[in-house]
Each structure stands twice: as structure tokens, then as C-alpha cells.
Amino acid sequence: MQALEGVNTSPAAAAAAHAPAPRRGIAGLAVAAVGVVYGDIGTSPLYTLKEVFNGPHAVPVTPQNVYGILSLVFWALVLVVSAKYVLFITRADNRGEGGIMALTSLVLRAVPPGRKAWVLSALGVFGAALFYGDGMITPAISVLSAVEGLEVATPAFRPYVLPIALAVLCGLFVIQRHGTGSVGRIFGPVMLVWFVLLAVLGIAGITLHPEIIGALDPRWALRFFADMPLVGWLSLGAVVLAITGGEALYADMGHFGRRPIKFAWFLVVFPSLYLNYLGQGALILDHPDNVRNPFYLLVPDALVYPMVAMATLATIIASQAVISGAYSLTRQAMQLGYAPRMRTIFTSEREMGQIYVPSINWMLLGAVVALVVGFRSSSALASAYGIAVTLTMMIDTLLAFVVVRALWGWGRLQAGLFLGVFLAVDVAFFSATTVKILAGGWFPLLVGALIFTLLTTWKRGRELLNRRLRTDTIPLDTFIRSMFNSPSPRVDGTAVFLTTWLEGVPRALLHNLVHNKVLHHRVVLLTVETADVPHVPDSERVAVEELDYGFYRVRVNYGFKDDPDLPAALVRCADFGLKFAMMETSFFLGRETLVSRVGSGMPRWREKLFIVMFRNAGSAADYFHIPPNRVVELGTQVEL
């Protein structure tokens, strides 16, 4: 990952990036953010308190403990979500984009190349890899917890909970190829209704014991820890479920902007969530047996079935946001050189960001089905949930510390307080979730480790391959001079040769010359470069350099969220005097076959893994939207 150039990352720049918008615009974006950004954390009331008082480390049900847990939930939401993410980390944007990769890019601006930069970059990539494990668990636990409400209505539904949940999840993944553009616009209003229902149910519960509002006092949390230190620490492993999904608001910042996300949190999401937790707490105080499922027992009997339907819809929306996030993250990884090309389908002609990656979709579906069948209940799945999120939150805190210290110019004391407070909270939650590793927490860690290995192996393998190709490449200026001494026959048309290095002669060009004995009238050496910014403006899309003997060098620039459409980019070359007639243009692509060798620069197992990944990578023609009838592939064998 390269350091960003020309990006102002000061707080003032961040504020300018999110300048005041019309009130109606902010309101509309805030409603949309409620549907996409807060779906995950918005479904947490379905299972959080149930797990606190019923999980493997269940907290004894006493009034003092109920107050203590509710106080912990409140201050976790305040410190982690409100303070750390909404007020601080969202200010560290990459030209309006958020997410752990954007944060890593900002960090690398402030750190010179070396071991420290490598460690920070690896942390960022590992944090991104952990998202996939979380993306597998979120749909499973969310939908299961919603459908389990049927058991509250009548125990006769118990045998059908698992099949219904599996049917809902399979249906969700099967329809992904059709896109969500037509129904996506209702996500915000539906989730807004969901949060209103959470608040109304919570207020109804609070009327049973209005004094429950006193749980906002942090002394209840402190007293809870003082009276039962071990139980208090272990309870954090379940309390953390209340903040899972909080990290998503930073990742989705590019879609909505900082202000709408902040408004949605403080005006709708936070109040609704905590009112519902207070209502559940009051219900437990009224009847301790209600801990078996306090969310659904808060619902009037006549409304349980409609609420199950509404909760299922809310969890589907929450799952959709995670699934779409996995597609987006995969595409960014491809653009930044961390993942091989994969088939990507754009599901909307109007929204460039709406994509579908079949291989990721079916991988997620297989994992989600395995999780549901293997764990069989949301309570069992809760053991696997949280550890990846808390680890990601720790990584965010460490990277944000570098940003506030090196880029924002905070003093040691101010930055130290930032790191000390938030890291202490993150470590407390993470340490409590580590006791769940054997009970299921191993799953997201294993997935994260595997994805991290794949991402870093591809990145390292491509670096070694490009280095090898450059070593064996003839310098371009030498080759062009030789054309004057021994000119080759020319044919009409334009030949475009894709290359990773514009100073050398592509192997495909040499093979074409050796086998066909001709050169085209115009020879274009084209390289695609991806910057560590989300988007590159059209005015900076291409750079053209005319050389001797009909040769041209063309550099095409993209951001990591741009669609790499080469034919569209080449149209802009006309501004530089280089016009392309697509039916008179041939694209020559090299199809390398890799052969392993001793001393390649990677361990033997990793080298073999890279070769397998390289062999199964998607077609460059498909990835760059090159018309198939204009493509010529020339094979070559390369020792890695």
C-alpha cells in the first residue's frame, strides 16, 4: 500500500470535505444511513441482554446486576461508538471515504518506508481480512435471532426455526445477482420504522420500572465491577454484542458523508437502541424469568408474529449491508493489488458502487449455512461473535493514534489520552472475548488469518513476478532505436499492449513480432495504475506520451473505487491527439504460465499458493471491459 499524495488530512480538511448540505439533503441521507450503516448494530437488541444473562458466563439476575449491565451497555455505546467512531475517527477520511483501508493509507503518509510502515500496513490488511469472518457470522446470528421469536409465540415452532432461517438466508444470497437497486431505496424507511418500534417497546417497558433510567449513572457499572470483578470482566464478552456493527459507520462514510451519519446516530439510532435496552432491563426486573428472551417478551402477545416478520426484515437488511460490504472490500483489494481479478457484475446502470462478485457470494453462503447448521442457535453463535469486531476496533484505535499524532499535529499528552482511553476500552472487550475462542471464537480468527494469508501472498507474488519480468525486459528506448536500423513491416490499425512497466518492451509485443513478423501502424504501451484514493477525476484519467516510430506510452489512472473501463478511458486520449477506433484496435494481452524455482523470494508453500491463485485469476479482458473480439492473447512461460 502506497502513501497518499496530495490529500489534506487535517481536521479542517475533513470538515470541508463534509460541508453543510441543504437540510432536506442531510435528512434524506440520514434516513438512508439508518438503513445501510446501522442495520447491524440496530439488530443487536435481539440477542445482547439475552446472552448476558443466559450465555456460558451468565450474569446472576439481581437488580444490582441488571443496573450494572445496562450502565455498561450505555457507556460502551458512548465511548466506543459515539466518541471514538462518530466524533473522532470519522474525521480521518480519504477524500470523503472511510474504512480501515482508507485509514491505513492515511497512516502510511506519515510513516517513512521501513519496518514500522510494514507493520502498520499489515495491521490494516489484517483488519480488512477480519471483516470477512464478521460478514459470515452477522447474517447467521441476526436472522436466527429474529426467527427464534417464533418460539416465544409458541414452542410448537421450535423444530422449524432452523429450516426457516436457512430458507431466508439462502434466498438472500440467491437474489444477490439481481442487485438491490430496486428495493434498496426502502431500506432506510424500513429501518427507521424498526428503530421507532425499538423505542416504543422500550418506553412501554420502562413504565414498569421508571427508576431503571438511573442505569445511565456510571457508578452502577463501577459498583458491578467492584462487587464481582471476574463476573464483570467475563460479562464484557456479551456486552460487546451491543456495539458490534459500530465500526461499520466509518466504513460506510463515503456513501453518505460524516454529518448525516452523525445525525442519524445521535437523533435516531442511539436513543432508540438504549430505550429498548432499558425496557428489556425493566422487564427483567419485573419478572427475572424474562431473561430467556427479553426482546420478544417485551412485545405484546398479539404483536409477536408481526414483530418476528419485522425483525426478520431488519436482519435481512443488516445482512445485505454486510454482504455488499464484502463485495466492495473485495473490489478495493483487487484494485490495490491485494487480490486476483474476480468476475464482477455491475447490478445497476446508475449506481457504480452496486456490484456483485459471484465467487465471494457463494463463499459467504457456504460459510453462513455451515455456521447455522453447526451452531444451531443464536446463543451458540454468540460465542463466535465479537472477537473479530473487537480486534478490528483495536486496530482502528492504533491506526487513528498515528493519524492524530503525526497528521493532525496533536501533542503527546493529547494523543496519549486518546490512545490510553480508547485502547483500554478496546483491550477490555477483546480480552473478555478471548475466553470464547474455543467455544466458536476461533472461526472468525481462522477466516481472518486465511484471508490475510491470501491477500499478502498475492501482493508479494505480484511484486516478485513484476520484478522478474522487468529483469528480463529489453529497455524500450533501445528497442525503438533498433527499429530504425532494422525496420519491421507495418500493418494498418492500432495495437495496444498492456504492461506493468512503461520503460520496457512487453513480452506480448516481442512474441507478436517474432511470430507474426509485423508491427501495427500505431503501437500503444498501456499501463493501469491505481491510487490510494477512492476516485480519480476524469481530467486526470489518462496521460499520453508520443514516442518515435509510431509508439505511444499511455498511463491510465483509477481510484480504488473506480470501475476500470479501458475502452471508456481510451476515448479521453483524443484530448491528447491519440484517437482510437475500437474496430481497428487490437489488444494484446500476455498469458503467463508460472513455473516455480529455487530462491524465488517466497517459501515453497506460499509460492505454490500464489501459482494456484494466478492460474485461477479472472481474465484481464473481462476485468478491463475490453471487447472479446478485439483481444489477442499470447502465452509465455515465466520462472517465478
Swiss-Prot record:
Protein name as catalogued: Probable potassium transport system protein Kup
Catalytic reaction list: K(+)(in) + H(+)(in) = K(+)(out) + H(+)(out)
Keyword Zinc appears in the UniProt entry: no
Membrane spanning residue stretches: 26-46, 69-89, 117-137, 155-175, 186-206, 224-244, 265-285, 297-317, 355-375, 384-404, 415-435, 437-457
Annotated keywords: Cell inner membrane, Cell membrane, Ion transport, Membrane, Potassium, Potassium transport, Symport, Transmembrane, Transmembrane helix, Transport
HAMAP family per record: Kup
A Pfam family recorded for this sequence: K_trans
Reported function: Transport of potassium into the cell. Likely operates as a K(+):H(+) symporter.
PANTHER family in the cross-refs: LOW AFFINITY POTASSIUM TRANSPORT SYSTEM PROTEIN KUP, OSMOTIC STRESS POTASSIUM TRANSPORTER
Disulfide partners: none
InterPro entries the record matches: K+_transporter, K_trans_C, K_trans_N, Kup
Family: Belongs to the HAK/KUP transporter (TC 2.A.72) family.
